[in-house]
Amino acid sequence: MKLIDLKFKTMGLIAGMCAITLASCSTDDDPVIPEPEPSVLQGSITSDLTLKSGNSYTLNGELLVKEGATLNIEPGVKIVAQYDDRVDYILIEQGAKINAEGTASAPIVMTSSKEEPGAWGGIHICGRAHTNAEGGKGSSEIGGAVYGGDNDADNSGVLKYVRVEYTGYAFDEEHEANGMTFYGVGNGTVVENCEAYHGSDDGFEFFGGSVNVKNMVVVNCSDDSFDWTEGWNGKGENLVAFQESEGTLGYDCDCLIEADNNENNYAATPVSHPVLRNLILVGNGGSKQGIRLRRGTEVEITFAKVCGKAKALAVESAETENALLNGTSKLESVSISGTLDSKEGIYTNELFVGAGNLTEQSFEYASLDDIEKECTWMNGWTK
């Protein structure tokens, strides 16, 4: 196991010395001294590294997992991003992996020494699955790493029972870091039981790819809770977003879901078409949308409750609305507070209700605890 450019405190090594005699000295009984564990993470990983269960590590700057290397993180590990003049984030490049497998009783926590939204830069994973970005390739917003390709079964590792806190670092006026960002990540990657907590950008964002996710929670992220673009077509099951009241947080959060196909080309292929099931999305008022479907995206949503936004469900662009009208996209057993808002007037509130969905509903989700009563899979590891 070798870590290149990884900075850690130097530890002295004490080796036994062999006495010099007329006979040769045997080294059979010399002690084997293990390589010291790094306590500060920084730089580039070029071969496998394991962060041991129960330990705490400091992230000081960028941590880049390079092609061929795997970052293994055991249950109960805590990574604390040092809040200073360095930009802290973890980037998994194409051909690299992260295997972060916590448990409900010992989740992996990635947080900051400054417990405020926007304190550090989150996790960014670049895979070789598709993107409908021009040329079929893209460059990650954070770190500038290449992503995209034609291998939708690409495997970037495992994320289970992982919580990221206080992400959303602003690199400049246009680029803030999400909690977790999936760039062209394939469905060979396992993503389950993950939470984004109190970030100042999106909770989870998908740039293309086919990765499937399950049991995902976003709490109080001031931008969008879930966001997709560039042709994401994975599956999502058990998605929860909760935004505390504006009076409590001091700010109005953005959309619970913001969904695009491609900002520059609404007809770009492969078209965004995730299949989502079992959603509870609770907003904190203001002028933003609950679910915002636009820019050519397609989607299938079954069993969803959406409340707490001025526009619980908004559809925009002819491409997106026509997909709902002709059945390419499906909204089934969706209950919303208020009514559906149609920008183009193609897929209307009447059509939405006629498909068996419910409007003007009232929900009692005053706290995250109220959601946990329905979603017992959240118990024990969410915050």
Regions found by a protein language model. Give the residues of each.
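Extracellular beta-rich repeat passengers
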Residues: 32-71, 82-95, 102, 111-201, ...
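Glycine-rich loop(s) and the adjacent beta-strand/alpha-helix scaffold that form part
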Residues: 106-107
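Catalytic metal-binding/acid-base residues of hydrolase active sites
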Residues: 78
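Bacterial Sec-dependent N-terminal signal peptides
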Residues: 1-4, 15-42
